[in-house]
A protein has these predicted regions:
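GIY-YIG nuclease catalytic motif and its immediate N-terminal context
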Residues: 1-36, 43, 50-67, 72, ...
């Protein structure tokens, strides 16, 4: 099984959203259709980055890191 960590960028407010899912294609569709409460008001969105994991613990650990202050800075540097 694959686990995805992804980053969306809002063209409305120029901010990023960090999320995780087991089905990236379906999750992205939900975001773009406005079916996700956290990003509904920030449409239009664009997928700007994603990572694929096979280890669930590493997946969760990396999400927590990217959502921290240092992690967001690291992610912005990567992008």
């Amino acid at each position: 099984m694959f686990y995805y960590l992804y980053v969306l960028k809002s063209f409305k407010d120029n901010k990023i959203y960090i999320g995780k899912t087991k089905n990236l294609k379906q999750r992205l569709k939900n975001h773009l259709r406005g079916n996700v409460k956290a990003t509904k008001s920030r449409i239009p969105l664009k997928l700007i980055y994603y990572d694929v994991y096979t280890n669930k613990e590493q997946w969760s650990k990396q999400e927590k890191f990217y959502k921290s202050g240092i992690g967001r800075d690291t992610l912005k540097y990567k992008l």
